[in-house]
A protein has these predicted regions:
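Internal gly/pro-rich beta-alpha loop/helix module
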Residues: 158-160, 165-261
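Short acidic low-complexity segments
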Residues: 144-157, 353-357
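Small-residue (G/A/S/T)-rich helix-start motifs and N-terminal tracts that mark the onset
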Residues: 1-121, 128, 132, 221, ...
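Short amphipathic alpha-helical segment within the helicase RecA-like ATPase core
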Residues: 129, 150, 165
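Short acidic loop-to-helix transition motifs that present clustered carboxylates
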Residues: 151, 201-207, 230, 347-348, ...
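Short aromatic/hydrophobic-glycine micro-motifs
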Residues: 143-144, 460
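A short, aliphatic-rich alpha-helical micro-motif
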Residues: 153-159, 216, 359-360, 418
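Conserved nucleotide-cofactor-binding alpha/beta core module
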Residues: 133-138
Length: 560
């Protein structure tokens, strides 16, 4: 965020003071909205998450100075807003917002009840800093800041606490006075019933990866500026953000070009359903995509049903399943719409011959769900990577196919294949870590960077499944962070459904990155819908996703 501020100031000519004023106006408006004083907040994108008198309209006008004895107007007790300001720009934003509340009192205000303002700081600000300048202006309105203390905050009994302690630049664990301030704000929220509004991101939450840096403020709402940050959506920090509101302050995408990773592609900014392919009214089963699903093994027939069924439900015109002979009867009974071919799971030669026969039929293939890591499965994956460039238009690799690539060092074949046709990998975190040959914990620290480097090296697209799935591609600067979904999707077979969906979207002509992003988004929506119909996320099964997929892609295509 600091880099974006500098770029906006240096390259676009927007003074830093103007950006701060606009940010403070956004904070001020959210204060009014939360306290219900009647001032409508300006247009904003949103997701779900010294004491001086600022009087609203209808109040006695113009009073500033010490208001500790003021009990408000005839409409009731005055609201109390405590601003806890750190020494950096985040604290200056908070102090500036407090000053705007005081200006409203002088001008007659816009609310219906007074807002009593008290500003707490952590240390005397240094000369020449934005915070020092904002506090100096506050003094002109009769407002004097005071050092933060738990006793003073408790005694003030605020209705609202504005957390302006730390912004997006925090990267170390909280300690000392800062930790005490965070604990104090949480205490007043929990025991005193105060609402908490965080400025940019709750203090103690890493804006880059959502980590909790020791401890964090538990906000009811977060107002951020210009663009969302990854920490607003990544666990565990996203749970501390409450409702997240994004307000424009003049930092444009042009100002962000110096820092490409800020182009995090979120549904709230550009819904992926907008890029779903149009259905040709004169099309036929052949023109809507022919998908070969290579899945299943002995006693693992469900993966075939989930993946192939999802491909059909997401719009594929024809689907054929290639699996072991033991699964034939189950497939014919549960998914009669699918074409079917089988091979001997104990014979690598049988598997290779069946694959070669069927690759010529399909335009696109999905390999991996429930495939196992047998010699026959290894032969299929190896042969598939060799033959796909000349036989297919696109390939999706999931589950055991990814494990086989990692365990048998098939990276060179993967890259050669991906240089010829679009290849999408859909691993979960553990499979992805195995593919990258790192520990899962290391991957979780910075998934976007790890995934981006691998995608560039191997010329592919990766959809890494997690509570917040991430999509990257070698040819796409954006990183898509999916925010749809529910823990109802934490069930066996859910990933097979997703893989089938992504393959179907690819087969209908979508770019690999777009197919992966839209697939992840729709899959999450399907989980939410299934959980809503069942009434309990615990009871949702993968087959329920197939039921709710009916109409879902078309419903969102119509909204684009």
């Amino acid at each position: 965020m600091a880099q974006a501020d500098r770029t906006a100031s240096e390259k676009l000519g927007i003074p830093a003071a103007v950006l701060m004023e606009r940010a403070a106006m956004a904070v001020r408006d959210e204060v009014y909205a939360i306290l219900g004083t009647g001032r409508p907040a300006a247009a904003a994108d949103s997701l779900t998450a010294g004491e001086t008198c600022a009087a609203g309209a209808g109040a006695e006008s113009g009073r500033t100075g010490d208001c500790r004895e003021n009990t408000g107007t005839g409409s009731g007790r005055a609201f109390r807003a405590a601003f806890v300001c750190g020494k950096g720009n985040n604290g200056a934003d908070g102090a500036c917002a407090a000053r705007l509340l005081l200006e409203d009192s002088t001008a007659g205000g816009c609310g219906h009840r007074q807002v009593l303002v008290r500003v707490f700081t952590m240390a005397p600000p240094k000369e020449g800093t934005p915070l020092r300048a904002q506090l100096h202006t506050l003094h002109a309105y009769g407002c004097r800041e005071e050092p933060f203390s738990q006793e003073a905050l408790d005694a003030f009994a605020p209705d609202l606490i504005v957390d302006a302690l730390f912004g997006t630049g925090l990267s170390r664990d909280l300690e000392g006075d800062a930790l005490s301030a965070v604990q104090g704000m949480n205490r007043v929220r929990e025991q005193g019933g105060a609402a908490v509004l965080a400025v940019d991101i709750p203090s103690g939450v890493s804006s880059s990866d959502g980590r909790i840096l020791g401890e964090c403020v538990r906000a009811d709402e977060t107002v951020t500026f210009a663009f969302y940050k990854r920490g607003h959506f990544l666990y565990p920090g996203c749970r501390a953000c409450g409702k997240v509101v994004c307000r424009p302050i003049g930092i444009t995408k042009k100002a962000l070009q110096a820092k490409p990773e800020m182009f995090t592609y979120l549904p709230q900014e550009d819904p992926p359903e907008r890029i779903l392919p149009e259905r040709d009214p004169a099309g036929n089963k052949g023109t809507n995509g022919k998908v070969l699903v290579i899945a299943g093994s002995l006693n693992v027939a469900g993966a075939c049903v989930m993946a192939a069924g999802a491909a059909y439900r997401t719009g594929a015109g024809m689907v054929k399943v290639l699996t072991v002979r033991e699964n034939r009867e189950i497939l014919q009974e549960t998914l009669p719409e699918a074409l079917l071919d089988t091979y001997s799971g104990s014979s690598a030669q049988s598997a290779r011959e069946a694959l070669q026969k069927n690759l010529g039929w399909a335009g696109y293939a999905l390999a991996g769900p429930g495939l196992s890591k047998s010699e026959a499965a290894k032969e299929i994956v190896t042969e598939l990577l060799l033959e796909a460039p000349s036989k297919l238009k696109g390939l999706v690799l999931d589950a055991d196919a990814i494990r086989l690539i990692a365990e048998n060092d098939l990276y060179a074949l993967l890259r050669a294949c991906a240089e010829s046709i679009p290849v999408i990998l859909t691993p979960h975190m553990a499979e992805c870590a195995a593919l990258l040959r790192i520990e899962t914990g290391e991957l979780k620290e910075d998934p976007a960077t790890w995934l981006k480097n691998f995608a560039k090296l191997h010329h592919c697209t990766i959809l890494c499944k997690d509570a917040r799935s991430t999509v990257v591609s070698y040819d796409e600067r954006k990183v898509y962070l999916n925010t749809s979904g529910t823990n109802a999707l934490s069930k066996a077979g859910s990933g097979d459904v997703l893989a089938g969906m992504v393959t179907a979207l690819l087969a209908q002509g979508m770019r690999a990155f777009d197919a992966a992003a839209a697939g992840a988004y729709l899959h999450g929506l399907a989980g939410v819908k299934a959980a809503g119909l069942s009434g309990d996320a615990r009871s949702v099964m993968a087959r329920d996703l197939l039921r709710v997929l009916e109409g879902l892609p078309e419903e969102f295509a119509a909204r684009s």
